[in-house]
Every structure is written in structure tokens, then in C-alpha cells.
Curated annotation (Swiss-Prot):
It catalyses: tRNA(n+1) + phosphate = tRNA(n) + a ribonucleoside 5'-diphosphate. It comes from Pseudoalteromonas translucida (strain TAC 125). This is Ribonuclease PH. The lineage of its organism: Bacteria, Pseudomonadati, Pseudomonadota, Gammaproteobacteria, Alteromonadales. Homohexameric ring arranged as a trimer of dimers. Belongs to the RNase PH family. Signal peptide: none annotated. Its EC number is 2.7.7.56. Gene3D superfamilies: GHMP Kinase, N-terminal domain (3.30.230.70). SUPFAM superfamilies: Ribonuclease PH domain 2-like, Ribosomal protein S5 domain 2-like.
Length: 237
């Protein structure tokens, strides 16, 4: 039995609240149960130096956690003078995933920066960030079309992400912190709305896992991501 009494394939309640802030071209508060992340999308003309002259756009991402997003206070990384390795890994993951969903040529020489700020953490912050960032990105692209910055929609497909894992010998989806911290296997999966894989991150925290267990985890992820993308589309309708 899971601590939340959810079934193995049952995800937490998921919501996407659009236009959550005033100034950003796209802003979404995404909630996966008690995990809450504010995702904003900022549009700027021009691209990084290494992209200039290619006729393509770029998507960056930054990720951070508020000091009291967790059970105990964590000092702001700015106060420590540098970002941690986990932060850099997650923000690169978010950016990679979003770039895979966009035709960068159709974006023109424009840059979209996605900021994902974790307000409250209860497991799955990176996957919630990716799922929320995709909705914020859609709103930013709509803004760009309305302003005449682009002629067509660069979005190739919606994307979403979910955590899956093996907890007390059982494959489960959408791990809360109490499950994630004790899981024998922890995996993050990012898929397109067509069911294609963008990225899989999986680690055996305790015992190695089998190919059969891997298949079971990926099946759980595919089912869960289909549910999340349905909620994304409802929020955007």
C-alpha cells in the first residue's frame, strides 16, 4: 500500500493555472498534489552568440527552489555564490526537453527563457516543471504570433513528464517525497503527446532492476503522461 493510498498507476491531482503572473508572456502555476511550481516564459528578440546567423531560435531554462519549499530551509543558491550540480542538471533537462518539442527554425532568431521556481516540493519537481513549462511555452508562442514575431506555430507537439519507480517491490507512478526517498528504483520519463521518448533518466537506488520491470515502468509512464497531456490541453482550451 502506498502512503497516499493511491493505486500503483494513479497520479496525484494535476492542475495548470495559466496567466498566474502579470508580466511574463507565459505563466503557469502547475500543481502535482502538494508539489507546486511556478513556470514563466519570457520572450526576447535575438539569440545567444553561438546561434547567430543560423536563422533559428533558442530556448533556455532556469530552475530553483524557494528556501522553504522543503521540510527544512535551504539557503538560496545566490547566497552561496553558485548553483549546485542538481540545479544545473535539472535546468538543462528542462531546456533540452522543450527544444525537442519546438521547430527552432520557425521560432526565428528569438529566445524564450523558461523559469521554473519550486514553491513547494513533495517529489517530482523536475517532471512537474517540464509539464508546466510546456503550457507556459504554448502561451508565449501564442503571444509571439499575436505580435507578429513569428508567422506560424513552432510547437511540434505537447510534451509532459512523470516520475515512476519501484517502491517496496511495486512499480508505481508519480512518486511523492516519502516514496521517492525510499524507492529501490527511481526514473523520470519525458514523452511527446504521440508517445515518443524525449528522455529517460533511471537509476537503481538499491537492487538492480530487470528489463521486465523497466517495461512495466515505461508502460506506467506512458499511461500517466497521456493523462497529464489531456489536462494540459483542457487548460489550454
Amino acid at each position: 500500500m502506498r502512503p497516499s493510498e493511491r493505486t500503483a498507476n494513479q497520479i496525484r491531482p494535476v492542475t495548470f493555472t495559466r496567466n498566474y503572473t502579470l508580466h511574463a508572456e507565459g505563466s503557469v502555476l502547475v500543481e502535482f498534489g502538494n508539489t507546486k511550481v511556478l513556470c514563466t516564459a519570457t520572450v526576447e528578440s535575438g539569440v545567444p552568440r553561438f546561434m547567430k546567423g543560423q536563422g533559428k531560435g533558442w530556448i533556455n531554462a532556469e530552475y530553483g527552489m524557494l528556501p522553504r519549499a522543503t521540510h527544512t530551509r535551504n539557503a538560496r543558491e545566490a547566497a552561496r555564490g553558485k548553483q549546485g550540480g542538481r540545479t544545473m542538471e535539472i535546468q538543462r533537462l528542462i531546456a533540452r526537453a522543450l527544444r525537442a518539442a519546438v521547430d527552432l527554425k520557425a521560432l526565428g532568431e528569438n529566445t524564450i527563457t523558461i523559469d521554473c521556481d519550486v514553491i513547494q516540493a513533495d517529489g517530482g519537481t523536475r517532471t512537474a516543471s517540464i509539464s508546466g513549462a510546456c503550457v507556459a511555452l504554448v502561451d508565449a508562442l501564442t503571444h509571439m504570433r499575436a505580435k507578429g514575431m513569428i508567422n506560424s506555430n513552432p510547437l511540434k507537439y505537447m510534451i509532459a513528464a512523470i516520475s515512476v519507480g519501484i517502491y517496496k517491490g511495486q512499480a508505481i507512478s508519480d512518486l511523492e517525497y516519502i516514496e521517492d526517498s525510499a524507492a529501490e528504483t527511481d526514473m523520470n520519463v519525458i514523452l511527446t503527446e504521440t508517445g515518443k521518448i524525449i528522455e529517460i533518466q533511471g537509476t537503481a537506488e538499491g537492487e538492480p532492476f530487470s528489463f521486465d520491470e523497466l517495461d512495466e515502468l515505461l508502460t506506467l509512464a506512458k499511461h500517466s503522461i497521456r493523462e497529464i497531456i489531456d489536462v494540459q490541453k483542457q487548460a489550454l482550451a
